[in-house]
Regions:
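Charged, compositionally biased N-terminal leader segments and the immediate start
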Residues: 1-16
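A polyanion-binding, active-site-adjacent surface
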Residues: 2-3, 18-246
Length: 246
């Protein structure tokens, strides 16, 4: 006749069983009847990758250093990191610095920047109350479009800036910005006019101010996009520091 376990042994086995059941419940992997393998939870196949730690903008800038991660460092004058409020609920992301931005080390300071300032002010905000950045932080020669290897080196720092600022809404200025932020190759004409979700942040693609200077008839469409941003911020309970015009 097999030995009967004592009370302490039974209590220990019971605690181990309860712990095992709790682990299975948390993982969504209860044992199935008849010895069949349990059906995996919906996200069980994905590795448990911890979220990147949130750093301050100063920490992100310090990590960037005097960046030499891509070939653009050989032709740039300045690293154009970004400008604005470090806790801005509204962020604008463009494409890359131009000649004036490269000289001054600040995004959107040329003619396109003057137009962007007017657009932001028309929404009731300012350069000081939003945050402005670009996909690339170094000027591409001849103001050409960003190349994939350049974007790949800059994007982790853009992601870190977005985590540091934690905006509620991002306005993506132009196709390269929208494509990079949203992971798509769709044209801006398809993406604009509606919100897209990026890890819980609302993204509104619209035309780049430089394009609007070349095609002023599209300013009406861009303003329609920005009015949607104003309405979304209002829905989120975020008041602009000023009063929008019109």
């Amino acid at each position: 006749m097999p030995a009967v376990p004592d009370v302490d042994e039974v209590a220990t086995l019971a605690r181990q069983l309860r712990a095992q059941l709790v682990r299975h419940a948390a993982a969504g992997t209860w044992a199935a009847p008849g010895g069949r393998s349990p059906r995996p939870a919906r996200d069980e196949a994905e590795p448990d990758v911890p979220a990147a730690p949130r750093r301050s903008l100063a920490q992100v800038r310090a990590e960037l250093g005097e960046c030499t991660r891509c070939k653009l460092h050989t032709t740039r004058r300045s690293i154009v990191f970004g400008v604005g409020a470090e806790d801005a609920p509204l962020m604008f992301v463009g494409e890359a610095p131009g000649e004036q931005e490269d000289k001054r080390g600040e995004p959107f300071v040329g003619p396109a920047g003057e137009l962007l300032d007017k657009m932001i002010e028309a929404m009731g905000w300012s350069r000081q109350t939003v945050y402005i950045a670009n996909i690339l932080m170094c000027r591409p020669p001849g103001n050409r479009n960003p190349q994939p290897d350049e974007v790949a080196q800059c994007k982790p720092f853009l992601d870190a800036k977005i985590r540091a600022i934690a905006p509620r809404v991002i306005v993506a200025l132009g196709r390269p910005s929208a494509n990079t932020l949203l992971g798509t190759d769709a044209p801006i004409s398809v993406l604009r006019g509606k919100f897209h979700d990026r890890h819980g942040v609302r993204v509104m693609p619209t035309f780049h101010p430089a394009y609007l200077l070349r095609e002023p008839d599209r300013k009406r469409d861009a303003w329609a996009d920005l009015k949607l941003v104003i309405a979304e911020l209002d829905r989120l309970g975020i008041a602009a520091p000023g009063t929008p015009r019109g």
